[in-house]
């Protein structure tokens, strides 16, 4: 079983709340508190991780910690965000199912940091090929880029996400990231034009102002932060810095991240120019026009600067802000006229344009990231949801309403999958179970999204009526929901608030601005202005139309519901999102996104991280009991603890259980083809013989349930051991197969090489045979021995000296390092006194050596060189015309070499071939005479050849004492050689095997 070395000095409380001795809310709170005080910010409730924001660096992240958690089960190791990431990754690999990690909690609870640690872990444990590294780097670098454009300092969090993000990482079959996709939700674009006192605008604005060089500041017409209306609005002193955030360093990181995701320098410049233009838009002020019924821009120079940054005409910019083009009529009767805007209307248009430009720019950056990690194939994914937490402010508007709505739906998922579905599953499977009560927030979700009578539906309907306003909207809400358990109206003289009783508590919403923000109106004049820009970025972001998924069946149901409930047909029709005459409302678009998100989450195996904000002061390790208790309550942690405490830590269908563990059972291996349930019973029966787990296991109708992790550890250990054994066996068989395959291939190669070498030898022998024929045919009588040429003879090393170290060393010393022995044989030499002397002949690739053997000496020598003749010194070689074996090598400016050998044909043929190669094709000269004149050490000498019919006496001087073909006898000044008649000179050499 895998083990983990725990730090006993940090053994505070219990790591898993299921192990609490006393199960109560107070003991749960106390356990979280004492662990948090000791810096132990992670605690689990079975598979659910509870994470508490420490507000300081703890040193519990990095490669060392990653290695500790890699491949470990959550039961084996202390709870950690890495453990959740590893569990999701292992499940994706082993089960082949999509996974999602849902991180929830209120603003400032540490959700964004948790998501970054998850990304870091996945990047660290996966492959390192060039493409995988590129994808991982892009995914990691997308975080600082999105934080720059989507995060801001709020009263509760210095790095608060002001948008929602669902990051899907797609993996290939090898388990490495091959791409991904980011979906963003509801950017808080109203922050661009207005922030609460003590808060900041989006980080990127301060990064741009603080991190730009002097040249960039001049290029983009940048000012100091306190000179921008959009950065100081509603803030008496302005808030331009944030603890723990360095805007100058952040700007460098943002630029680098842009480069990584494919935003090049020219595009970066357009983005920064657009950001500067957005800030300067806020400084535009308007005066009443001379006619008094319109408005004009008060600072034309500023308008020119903005127009220059945006690549538009300054006059058209002013016209688009201070007037609207209205079209009436249809077809040929359509007419267009300009309507002047009041100062207030012009300011509204200015702010709407700034918000829309920034929002579209943010969407563009998300698209650029997605393009850089896009994959065409469909694979398994791990999704990480980092979405804004539940928010309750002094003034809660449309943004908080949407944020709390999505948190309400996420809470419903948690309830469905961890409390409701789990208990229902026990009942359906026939498992003995005592129900645990919990708070179901479905009624609150229905209050917001139900059709046709839900807050979002009524809001969209009210936006359709020209006379609709915030007051008529709240009147309608009070009318329809006055008796709803999750809705309350506020009894005040000015009725501008309503209350929703969320799972996290009651929230007072201010209706002011709801309709405007839902309509999200941007006049066509401003869209036309942007699309006429010389800046390609502005044109692209304003022309881009996001895809909208519309379910035709749901659309028909919506239309029918409106008709049945007495709403006007026109209103019903215009509410349907496919009606191009009406813009899609922000609320409707957000609801569609939430629906799509829920569909994705429900299609995955979920993992939960519940984040808790310990205090509102953002102080390290400070514990606010009431605040934490409130979060524990609305997150449903105690109810989750009760279900997990009484429930089962593991459940799986019989078929999937068999697929994973069938190899460890004697009766189920190597293949189980019977009923899966029967197989599981047999397998667990064998396990029960080893340890008593009868009380730990229950069998449902379709699933097996295991209460505690110990049997799982045993199962996994057995499986790992079995897999190792099988891997060893497979490896052994594979090695044997590979070895045999290698042996057979080697054997075949040897045979092929041998055959090829034999073929080459035959070809060379045939060539040499033909060469010998060209030398001797019609020039010299032949004897039977000389015309029979064996293939082995042409190898030439008759004395087997090629591997003799002394011979090799001597030849290299005499001739040079390139000397190679080509021929060695025994010969007879005719001395100056015409006596026959024994010699050995060595031929290299450029020299002839005659040697005489002697007794081996201590230095290894065993012969002496008597004569050294370079090929270049050979003048010619002479032979008789008879069938003898004598020949003379005539040497330039030296005495000649008179030799005799019965291997004359092979020697001369090979020598002729080597001579020609060494002297660049020069042919060796051969002479055939009845007598041969030559020079020995004493002077001129001669070989005289006499053909005789028979040989009656054997001369002691004969080189071939036992040869019947010729004899040699020394005379005074010559050597007489008597030769029997031989074969015809026309006889051809033939090849024999031996």
Curated annotation (Swiss-Prot):
Binding site for ATP: 105-112
Domain IQ: 723-744, 745-774
Gene Ontology MF terms: actin filament binding; ATP binding; calmodulin binding; microfilament motor activity
CDD domains: MYSc_Myo1
InterPro entries assigned to the protein according to its UniProt record, in alphabetical order: IQ_motif_EF-hand-BS, Kinesin_motor_dom_sf, Myosin_head_motor_dom-like, Myosin_TH1, MYSc_Myo1, P-loop_NTPase
Cellular component annotations (GO), alphabetically ordered: actin cytoskeleton; cell leading edge; cell-cell junction; cytoplasm; cytosol; myosin complex; plasma membrane; pseudopodium
Keywords attached to this entry: Actin-binding, ATP-binding, Calmodulin-binding, Motor protein, Myosin, Nucleotide-binding, Repeat
One BP annotation, GO: actin cytoskeleton organization
Domain Myosin motor, chain residue ranges per copy: 12-720
Domain of life: Eukaryota
Disulfide topology: none
Residues covered by the TH1 domain: 782-970
UniProt keyword Nucleotide-binding, yes or no: yes
Chain spans, region Actin-binding: 574-654
Similarity comment: Belongs to the TRAFAC class myosin-kinesin ATPase superfamily. Myosin family.
Subunit structure as annotated in this protein's UniProt entry: Myosin I heavy chain is single-headed. Dimer of a heavy and a light chain. Inability to self-assemble into filaments.
Annotated function: Actin-based motor protein, possibly involved in a wide range of motile processes, such as cell movement across a surface, and extension and retraction of pseudopodia or lamellipodia.
Protein name: Myosin IA heavy chain
Organism expressing this protein natively: Dictyostelium discoideum (Social amoeba)
């Amino acid at each position: 079983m895998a083990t983990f070395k725990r730090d006993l000095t940090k053994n505070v409380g219990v790591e898993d709340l299921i192990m609490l001795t006393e199960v109560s809310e107070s003991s749960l709170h106390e356990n979280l508190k004492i662990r948090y005080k000791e810096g132990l910010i992670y605690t689990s409730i079975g598979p659910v991780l509870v994470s508490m924001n420490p507000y300081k660096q703890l040193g519990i992240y990095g490669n060392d910690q990653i290695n500790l958690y890699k491949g470990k089960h959550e039961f084996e190791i202390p709870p950690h965000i890495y453990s959740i990431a590893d569990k999701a990754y292992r499940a994706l690999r082993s089960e082949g199912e999509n996974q999602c990690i849902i991180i929830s909690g209120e603003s400032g609870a540490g959700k964004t940091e948790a998501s970054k640690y998850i990304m870091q872990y996945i990047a660290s444990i996966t492959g390192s090929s060039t493409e995988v590294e590129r994808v991982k780097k892009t995914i990691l670098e997308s975080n600082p880029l999105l934080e720059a454009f989507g995060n801001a300092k709020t009263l509760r969090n210095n790095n608060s996400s002001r948008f929602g993000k669902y990051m899907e990482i797609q993996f290939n079959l090898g388990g490495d990231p091959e791409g991904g996709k980011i979906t963003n939700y509801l950017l808080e674009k109203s922050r661009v034009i207005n922030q609460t006192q003590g808060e900041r605008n989006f980080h990127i604005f301060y990064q741009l102002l603080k991190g730009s060089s002097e040249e960039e500041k001049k290029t983009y017409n940048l000012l100091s932060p306190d000179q921008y209306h959009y950065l100081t609005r509603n803030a008496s002193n302005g808030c331009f810095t944030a603890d723990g955030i360095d805007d100058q360093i952040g700007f460098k990181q943002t630029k680098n991240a842009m480069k990584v995701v494919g935003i090049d320098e020219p595009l970066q410049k357009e983005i920064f120019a657009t950001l500067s233009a957005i800030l300067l838009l806020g400084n535009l002020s308007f005066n009443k026009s001379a006619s008094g019924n319109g408005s004009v821009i008060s600072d034309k120079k500023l308008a020119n600067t903005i127009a220059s940054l945006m690549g538009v005409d300054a006059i058209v910019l002013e016209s688009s802000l201070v007037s609207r083009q209205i079209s009436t009529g249809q077809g040929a009767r359509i007419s267009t006229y300009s309507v002047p805007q009041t100062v207030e209307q012009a300011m509204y248009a200015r702010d709407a344009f700034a918000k829309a430009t920034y929002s579209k720019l943010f969407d563009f950056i998300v698209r650029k990231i997605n393009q850089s990690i896009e994959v065409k194939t469909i694979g398994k994914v791990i999704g990480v949801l980092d979405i804004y937490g539940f928010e309750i402010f002094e003034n809660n508007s449309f943004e908080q309403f949407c944020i709390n709505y999505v948190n309400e739906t996420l809470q419903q998922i948690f309830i469905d999958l961890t409390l409701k579905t789990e208990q229902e599953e026990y009942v359906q499977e026939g498992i003995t179970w005592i129900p645990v009560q919990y708070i179901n927030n479905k009624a609150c979700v229905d209050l917001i999204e139900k059709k046709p009578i839900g807050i979002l539906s009524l809001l969209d309907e009210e936006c359709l009526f020209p006379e609709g306003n915030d007051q008529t909207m709240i009147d309608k809400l009070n009318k329809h929901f006055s008796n709803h358990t999750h809705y309350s109206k506020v009894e005040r003289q000015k009725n501008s608030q309503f209350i929703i009783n969320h799972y996290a508590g009651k929230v007072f919403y201010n209706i002011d601005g709801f309709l405007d923000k839902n309509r999200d109106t941007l006049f066509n004049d401003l869209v036309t202005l942007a699309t006429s820009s010389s800046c390609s970025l502005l044109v692209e972001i304003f022309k881009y139309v996001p895809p909208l998924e519309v379910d035709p069946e749901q659309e028909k149901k919506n239309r029918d519901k409106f008709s049945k409930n007495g709403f006007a047909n026109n209103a019903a029709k215009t509410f349907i999102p496919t009606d191009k005459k009406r813009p899609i409302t922000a609320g409707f678009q957000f609801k569609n996104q939430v629906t799509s998100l829920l569909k994705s989450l429900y299609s995955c195996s979920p993992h939960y991280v519940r984040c808790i904000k310990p205090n509102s002061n953002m102080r390290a390790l400070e514990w606010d009991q009431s605040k934490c208790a409130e979060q524990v309550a609305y997150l449903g942690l105690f109810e989750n603890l009760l279900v997990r405490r009484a429930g089962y830590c593991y459940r799986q269908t019989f078929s999937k259980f068999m697929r994973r563990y069938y190899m460890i059972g004697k009766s189920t291996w190597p293949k189980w083809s019977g009923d899966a349930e029967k197989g599981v019973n047999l397998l667990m029966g064998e396990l029960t013989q080893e340890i008593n787990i009868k009380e730990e296991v229950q069998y449902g109708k379709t699933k097996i349930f295991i209460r505690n992790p110990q049997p799982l550890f045993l199962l996994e250990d057995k499986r790992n051991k079995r897999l190792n054994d099988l891997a060893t066996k497979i490896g052994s068989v594979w090695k044997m197969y590979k070895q045999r395959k290698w042996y057979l291939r080697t054997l075949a190669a040897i045979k092929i090489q041998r055959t090829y070498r034999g073929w080459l030898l035959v070809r060379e022998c045939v060539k040499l045979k033909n060469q010998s024929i060209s030398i001797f045919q019609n020039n010299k009588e032949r004897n039977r021995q000389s015309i029979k040429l064996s293939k082995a003879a042409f190898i030439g090393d008759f004395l087997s000296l090629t591997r003799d170290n002394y011979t090799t060393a001597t030849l290299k010393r005499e001739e040079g390092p390139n000397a190679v022995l080509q021929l060695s044989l025994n010969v007879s030499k005719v001395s100056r006194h015409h006596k026959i002397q024994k010699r050995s002949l060595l031929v290299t690739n450029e020299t002839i050596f005659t040697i005489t053997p002697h007794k081996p000496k201590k230095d290894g020598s065993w012969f002496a060189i008597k004569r050294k003749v370079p090929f270049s010194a050979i003048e010619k070689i002479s032979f008789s015309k008879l069938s003898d074996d004598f020949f003379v090598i005539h040497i330039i400016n030296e005495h000649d070499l008179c030799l005799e050998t019965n291997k004359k044909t092979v020697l001369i043929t090979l020598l002729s071939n080597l001579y020609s190669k060494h002297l660049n094709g020069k042919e060796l000269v051969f002479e055939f005479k009845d007598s041969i004149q030559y020079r020995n050490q004493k002077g001129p000498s001669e070989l005289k050849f006499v053909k005789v019919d028979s040989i009656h006496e054997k001369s002691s001087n004969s080189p071939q004492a036992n040869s019947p073909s010729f004899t040699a006898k020394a005379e005074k000044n010559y050597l007489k050689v008597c030769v029997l008649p031989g074969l015809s000179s026309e006889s051809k050499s033939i090849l024999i095997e031996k």
